Amino acid sequence: MAELRAPSSLSTERNGSASNTDVDKQKLNHLYQNGNKKTGSAESRMLVLAETIRAETQKLHAYLESNGIAQPDLSVDAPDDFPPLPDEIQESRQKIFLASRELTDIVRGPRETVRYAVWSYLDTLSLQLINSYGIAKLVPLDAPIKLTELQSKTPLEPVHLARALRHAMTNNIFREPSPGYIAHTSSSRILAQDPALQAWVGFNSEDAFPAAGHVLQALKDHPEAISSTHAGFNYAFNTVGQEPMFATLGKDLARAKRFAQAMHSFSHGEGYKVSYFVDNYDLSEVDKRGGTFVDIGGSHGFVSVELAKRWKDMKFIVEDLPKTIESAPQPISDDKTVADRISLQAHDFFQEQPVKGADVYFFRWIIHNHAKPYAVSILRNLIPALKPGARVVINDYCIREAGSENAWDEKLLRNMDMIMGALLNAQEREEWEFRELFEAADPRFKFKGVQRVENCKMSVIEAVWDE
């Protein structure tokens, strides 16, 4: 797909291709996947992993030290995040993490690994209680607080507060410097200070967590798992056959606001910046002719604003549901040359596309919310508006074949696939599944392929209308 460009300092990877970068990542993945590389004994494998951890930690430490960057630790004043790192140092982080995870499983043993994996929901439970009661904000940043004093500030009984805190401490969230005194670690401190992170924990523990617990029942009752009103979320909140998750959240202002903040927190994590798309997707031909870019389900137009800063002659139309459009900031940008080229329009993408003859129709974080029949319907609703050569661009996850994904990202992508199923009976897709969506929508869609910019977790999937 020629339209996705990468500067010389960034490489792009086509899903399933065999570029040198892909080969290197596959080798790295191969090295750290359990069972993929067997050594003579469990002992020798442990030594290989231990040496990897030592060597790569030395590299990371040396880079941070030589560049005057604070060393990470668990103390209350530790850095919130890693700064952007050179590729080879980021790779050291990945190797440390992956080797540590494998070594943990080896020394724990297979039976214990499985036995305790199923208890991971308890990590969510303790965080749910701490976040819901605002415990992190009640602990002073600069000194410990007596547990009995902390309890007096909450409606929780002492045993329940202590239980939640001491469980979270096993995940390095809070610490007990002396018996009966609670103090912050870096993780509990940032939970106290970051409202978007609080929203992320709240949404996942109070909305998604119950949904996950009801997936089994949903699958037993509806094994086809297609309808967005028969997902685990619907069973958890008694809306089976009535409405999808987004409608339920939309009726509750507090939950809707929390969801929006949670998505803001997630989308600002490593590998999600909109700049990956803005800086690398080529709109020069569209800009040259003063063309139109339609941002479908574009919320308050943050993608279009960034694109309009780069491309000076294009026009942008941001479409979303009426309540979302009504709540958008006015003006949409302080830069008049940007704001004047962006218009907002109420539209439900399950209805026929009203903007005819645009050059690009764009979906970011939209298609993955929908099972195949709904996703196909969304694409078909574009057809009456499409002119020959119009591009349909999807900015979403695209999962590589099992075992070929960078292992650093594999868990994240698989987690996202699971949660989309739990919330909406939706899914993350591989390249062939995106191709199938376009083919099912109309054979006049010509699938151009998938590309992903180095270090970005999201892909660009593109088709062109060829009537």
UniProtKB/Swiss-Prot annotation:
The biotechnology note for this entry reads:
Chloroanisoles such as 2,4,6-trichloroanisole (TCA) are known compounds which are usually associated with wine faults. They belong to the family of haloanisoles which are key substances responsible for cork taint in wines.
Write down the EC number. Answer: 2.1.1.136
Per the record, where are the segments of Polar residues compositional bias?
A: 8-21, 31-41
Question: Which Gene Ontology terms describe the biological processes this protein takes part in?
Answer: methylation; secondary metabolite biosynthetic process
Which residues constitute the catalytic centre?
H368
**Which PROSITE patterns does this UniProt record tie to the protein?**
SAM_OMT_II (PS51683)
Keyword check for Methyltransferase: yes
- UniProt superkingdom: Eukaryota
Q: Which GO terms describe its molecular function?
A: chlorophenol O-methyltransferase activity; O-methyltransferase activity
Induction text? Expression is specifically induced by several chlorophenols, especially if they contained three or more chlorine atoms in their structures, such as 2,4,6-trichlorophenol.
Temperature-related behavior of activity: Optimum temperature is 28 degrees Celsius.
Question: Does Cell membrane appear among the keywords?
Answer: no
Q: How does activity depend on pH?
A: Optimum pH is 8.2-8.5.
- Region: Disordered; residue ranges are 1-41
Enumerate the UniProt keywords alphabetically. Methyltransferase, S-adenosyl-L-methionine, Transferase
Give me the reactions it catalyses.
2,4,6-trichlorophenol + S-adenosyl-L-methionine = 2,4,6-trichloroanisole + S-adenosyl-L-homocysteine
The family annotation for this protein states: Belongs to the class I-like SAM-binding methyltransferase superfamily. Cation-independent O-methyltransferase family.
What does it do? Chlorophenol O-methyltransferase that methylates chlorophenols into chloroanisoles which are thought to be responsible for cork taint of wines. The only single chlorophenol (CP) methylated is 2-CP; neither 3-CP nor 4-CP are effective substrates. Within the dichlorophenols (DCPs), 2,4-DCP supports the highest rate of O-methylation, and the activity decreases in the following order: 2,3-DCP, 2,5-DCP, 2,6-DCP, and 3,4-DCP.
- Name recorded for this polypeptide: Chlorophenol O-methyltransferase
**Taxonomic lineage per UniProt?**
Eukaryota, Fungi, Dikarya, Ascomycota, Pezizomycotina
UniProt lists the gene as cmt1
